Amino acid sequence: METKNLIRMANDIGSFFVSYPDEEQAKRDAAGHIQKFWGRDMRKQIKEYVNDTPEKNSQLNTFVFNAINEYLKD
């Protein structure tokens, strides 16, 4: 899948979870959603994007970037 599509999907997921009152729990839940519902190759691709792209240059919103960086398992 194209990375731009994964970015759009991840940002959509983040837009739901960002409204949670506990930001750390929201990030865990957003990453958990990706972990549960995305295939291994999709998870690997978005994780590589986060690892290879400085946050300031990322097309992911800050919340999603941090959720993936901090909580998404390989």
List the predicted regions and their residue ranges:
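A domain-level signal for the structural core that forms small-molecule/cofactor-binding pockets
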Residues: 1-74
